[in-house]
UniProtKB/Swiss-Prot annotation:
Gene3D superfamilies linked: 3.40.50.10130, Crossover junction endonuclease EME1, DNA-binding domain, DNA polymerase beta, N-terminal domain-like
UniProt cross-references to Pfam families, sorted A to Z: ERCC4
Protein's recorded name: Probable crossover junction endonuclease mus81
Cofactor(s) needed for function: Mg(2+)
Role summary: Component of a DNA structure-specific endonuclease with substrate preference for branched DNA structures with a 5'-end at the branch nick. May be required in mitosis for the processing of stalled or collapsed replication fork intermediates. May be required in meiosis for the repair of meiosis-specific double strand breaks subsequent to single-end invasion (SEI).
Domain ERCC4: 635-731
Enzyme class: hydrolase
Molecular function GO terms recorded: 3'-flap endonuclease activity; crossover junction DNA endonuclease activity; DNA binding; metal ion binding
Length: 920
């Protein structure tokens, strides 16, 4: 099956690109099949060979050594060495006799001429035999060796000629010997100078990569045109001719580079003059063709093109044009410079392979930029030269901030008008206005959203802004006596709740309004759903009203500690009508802070209301309040999915009850063990501890399918500060053991994950996420650990019952989220339910987390700037340059240390949200 897949991949690649090096591609495919067929081999290593195959399919030049592959993507030192060893024993299928360069034909031509000169000397039979042997070996030798051998052959032939002339004569005198030496030296100098001139001119040879259409500029004032109706001349090539070019003739034949001198088809009688000078440096490589040209342009071509126009015919209509591959023309910039003689592509300077053409007509105008075509190559680190007609890249357009995008941000005028029509449901009684797109609405449950600035470990980057900004625009609250400039963000039109927020300075300025009315208030909040007084005061749908009547799930959204929404240094503002049904004490006046809700005189639960009425007892001398509550029991709640086996589903609960622990089995949306404290009125108070139990095999499977990462994230955002990850099974002992066979056997049982991989995951969880890792050997050890924790809670929370209650802050740290607010088990399940109604920003954040390399902190940073997928799409769509778009998120920061995203994640996000298939 693997061979068939490789064959299909190769055929698909060959359909798009004709591979010039099929033997190397075949060799790499064999390497891939060998790796796949090898037992225990790492299949990921085949990606290197596949990348090399893609580069070879795009590379337009033949490869004759492994060193030439160094410039290609996917070829490292080891792979280059393998290919080099392979090419030593395998010839190129298209060029079996070596590289097809023009220099080879020139060297063969010179060697053949030397053979002809040596054959004329009848007395040098031995030298002729040596020369023939050398010429036969020159096909496999390098060009430098050919030059040296030809030079040695010429010197030996001259010496033998001089010696043969002296045979039969008397012994030469000293003067004659000196004369012979001088002649030999002069001949050597002439030969060396001729060879140097030949090499210098050969280095200037241009060998263009063949393309579909080749156009040449001959330096004329007006270029040749293919239109017969035009008065200008035309020139056409026999290669890749089109139907329009069938009536034009341009005959030439480069011949085979392996057969010596190329053959030229000259149709004119004057071509014989060229054949006499076949050994010259320029005329030997010229190609003669006949073109039609207008009389008005004859003189112009004769003056400007001395190297091309050979002579005029008698009729004056035809001109013989000689084309040479040697660089003897003036206007050679339009041709693409090819590799010089026998140089590896790794040593070549990068060049731009840009061909400019306009359909079938060649255009020489500088304004014709739309017809430029850029041919990409698989070379590494391409540096393109600058041409007048090069591709013009549009400047990078930085994405505007969300506050500047008119598509989804609208600002009110500065004329102190009220908020205009906003599509907010009138059924919701709590209404608010946002000061900026960066302030999010609190959520309806007792804990804010995981993606709100208050719940992330990273403190909000906008904290200092609210502290220092005392301008009227920072205020969002609206009193009846004063108005402020409000900003409406249409991205949050679907938010369920809104808050009236006022800066800390404005609260101090408005303290006098509260002193005249709030002297006898007692600071208690009534959350009963049947409070008629509050409901009667909120019949008006005015935007300034603040309704405190809400369900138990929505109560006390803004009463948070340093990690909550109040951390943004803003305070809630109420009007007299809003506070008509509640008691307000003196803490607002003295401290200008929202008091903490503290349970006091809690009535027993009734059928009509499951929530409790809480109040605070404060005094002028004490800013901090103490809790007066008595707990009578601690209950351990076990998830109904935590069982020992199918037959013993209640094993854990029964064992805990036998040990004197009040344990119950209930459904938990998150976690496996939680604790609830029962007060004297039988009200439940969720404690600030949660345990997630994992067997070793379950941990391995959760890491593979991704549940491990998701559960850690949900646990960190559950509201519980003390998260315990309990691993049931032997992990540490297996890791520390020296037996490799034991590790291998252990890993096969646990989804092929080694103990080292599991240990790495646990250490990362403990250090990065701050989660407590606890290991137990068996389920009985797990039960012992649960018993010890429960006894600890009893000691801390029930020890002061006989002394009349108390505890203060010592009790608060054991309550859910370190708050003095009651949270029941039902509220906890609603808060952490997977199927709860997510807001758009939460749904968008969970979508971003699924992207490889995008963590929760990175998703939070993105949603701070782009709160909706549409805002992100519009911002990326405004970036026209792909390179700048792929690096758009590169400089985004995340985490406490303000680390950068990097290029890889930025490219993935850009390509995902700009992909047409994804948008459809």
């Amino acid at each position: 099956m693997s061979t068939n897949k490789n064959h299909n991949n190769n055929t698909n690649n060959n359909d798009n690109n004709i591979c010039i090096n099929p033997h190397i591609v075949e060799f790499l495919n064999k390497q891939i099949t060998n790796i796949k067929n090898r037992p225990g081999a790492d299949i990921k290593t085949t990606s290197i060979y596949k990348k090399a195959i893609r580069s070879l399919n795009l590379y337009p030049l033949p490869v004759f050594s492994g060193k030439e592959c160094e410039v290609l993507n996917g070829f490292g030192p080891s792979l280059t060495k393998k290919i080099n060893d392979y090419l030593k024993t395998t010839s190129h299928p298209l060029y079996p006799k070596g590289p097809p360069t023009p220099l080879k034909s020139i060297y063969n031509r010179n060697n053949n001429n030397n053979d002809n000169n040596n054959n004329n000397n009848n007395n040098n039979n031995n030298n002729n035999n040596n020369n023939n042997n050398n010429n036969n070996n020159n096909n496999n030798n390098s060009p430098k060796k050919k030059i040296r051998k030809s030079k040695n052959n010429n010197t030996t032939s001259t010496i033998s000629n001089t010696q043969s002339n002296l045979i039969g004569t008397e012994s030469p005198s000293k003067n004659q010997n000196k004369q012979l030496e001088r002649e030999l030296k002069s001949k050597k100098k002439k030969q060396q100078s001729a060879i140097l001139e030949q090499i210098v001119e050969e280095e200037d040879i241009n060998f263009e990569i063949p393309t579909n259409e080749n156009y040449y500029d001959y330096g004329s004032g007006s270029c040749f045109d293919n239109n017969d109706d035009n008065d200008d001349g035309y020139i056409s090539s026999g290669i890749n001719t089109t139907p329009d070019d069938l009536n034009k003739s341009f005959n030439f034949d480069f011949g085979s580079f392996d057969n010596g001198i190329p053959n030229y088809n000259n149709n004119n009688d004057n071509g014989g003059d060229n054949e006499n000078n076949i050994n010259s440096d320029i005329d030997s490589n010229k190609i003669k063709t006949t073109t039609s040209i207008n009389d008005n342009h004859k003189e112009k071509y004769q003056k400007n093109n001395e190297n091309y126009i050979h002579e005029n015919e008698d009729n004056g209509d035809d001109v013989i044009v000689l084309i040479s591959p040697i660089k003897t023309y003036k206007y050679g910039d339009m041709l693409n410079k090819s590799p010089s003689k026998f140089k590896s592509p790794s040593k070549l300077r990068s060049h731009n392979t840009t061909n400019t053409f306009n359909n079938s007509n060649f255009s020489n105008s500088d304004n014709d930029n739309n017809n430029n075509i850029r041919i990409t190559t698989p070379l590494k680190n391409q540096n393109f030269n600058k041409f007048n007609d090069s591709i013009i890249f549009s400047p990078s357009i930085s994405s505007p901030s969300p506050s500047k995008l008119s598509n989804y941000h609208k600002y009110l005028n500065n004329n102190n008008n009220n908020i205009k029509n906003t599509p907010i449901s009138t059924s919701k009684k709590r209404k608010c206005n946002f000061s900026s797109p960066l302030l999010f609405s609190p959520f309806k449950y007792g804990v804010t959203s995981p993606f709100s600035p208050s719940k992330m470990k990273l403190k909000s980057p906008f904290k200092k802004r609210f502290k220092n900004d005392k301008s009227p625009s920072s205020s969002i609250s609206k009193n009846k006596n004063s108005k402020s400039n409000d900003i409406v963000n249409n991205d949050f039109e679907d938010d369920d709740e809104v808050v009236n927020i006022q800066s800390e300075s404005e609260i101090n300025n408005n303290n006098n309004q509260f002193t005249s009315h709030n002297d006898n208030y007692n600071y208690s909040y009534n959350y009963n759903n049947n409070s008629n007084n509050i409901n009667n005061n909120n019949n008006n749908d005015d935007d300034d009203d603040f309704d405190l009547t809400e369900t138990e799930d929505e109560k006390d959204d803004y009463d948070k500690d340093d990690r909550t929404f109040s951390n943004l240094s803003v305070r809630l503002s109420f009007t007299e009508e809003d506070l008509a049904g509640v008691n307000i004490g003196e803490s607002i006046i003295n401290n200008s802070k929202l008091p903490k809700v503290i349970p006091s005189q809690i009535p027993p639960p009734t059928q009509s209301t499951q929530s409790t009425s809480t109040s605070t007892s404060t005094s002028k001398s004490k800013s901090k309040s103490t809790i007066k509550i008595k707990f009578k029991n601690i209950k351990c709640i076990i998830d109904n999915r935590e069982v020992k086996s199918v037959t013993e589903r209640d094993y854990i609960c029964n064992k805990l009850n036998e040990r004197g622990i009040n344990a119950q089995v209930k459904k938990l949306e998150l976690g496996d063990f939680v604790w609830v404290a029962i007060d004297e009125h039988d009200n439940e108070w969720l404690l600030n501890y949660i345990i997630e139990r994992k067997r070793v095999d379950d941990l391995s499977s959760s890491i593979i399918d991704g549940r491990y990462k998701e559960q850690k994230f949900r646990l960190s955002k559950s509201g519980c500060d003390n998260i315990i990850y309990l691993i049931e099974g032997i992990v540490s002992n297996t890791i520390n053991s020296s037996s490799q066979s034991q590790k291998k056997t252990w890993g096969t049982v646990n989804f092929s994950l080694s103990p080292d991989a599991l240990a790495t995951a646990l250490v990362t969880t403990s250090i990065c996420e701050g989660i407590i890792i606890k290991e137990t050997k068996t389920i009985d050890n797990t039960i012992d650990y649960i018993v010890n924790i429960t006894e600890y809670f009893k000691e801390k929370l029930l020890k002061n019952n006989n002394s009349g209650g108390g505890g203060g802050d010592e009790i608060i740290k054991f309550l859910f989220a370190n708050k003095n607010t009651q949270c029941t088990l039902e509220n906890f399940n609603q808060l952490n339910s997977k199927s709860k109604g997510l807001k758009l920003i939460e749904f968008f954040a969970t979508q971003l987390i699924q992207i490889p390399g995008c963590s929760a902190e990175k998703a939070h940073s993105i949603t701070q700037v782009y709160p909706t997928p549409m805002s992100l799409y519009l911002a990326l769509k405004a970036i026209k340059d792909k390179e700048s778009g792929e690096s758009h998120f590169k400089d985004f920061t995340f985490g406490k240390n303000k680390r950068r995203f990097g290029q890889d994640v930025s490219e993935v996000i850009y390509n995902l949200y700009t992909n047409k298939k994804y948008l459809n």
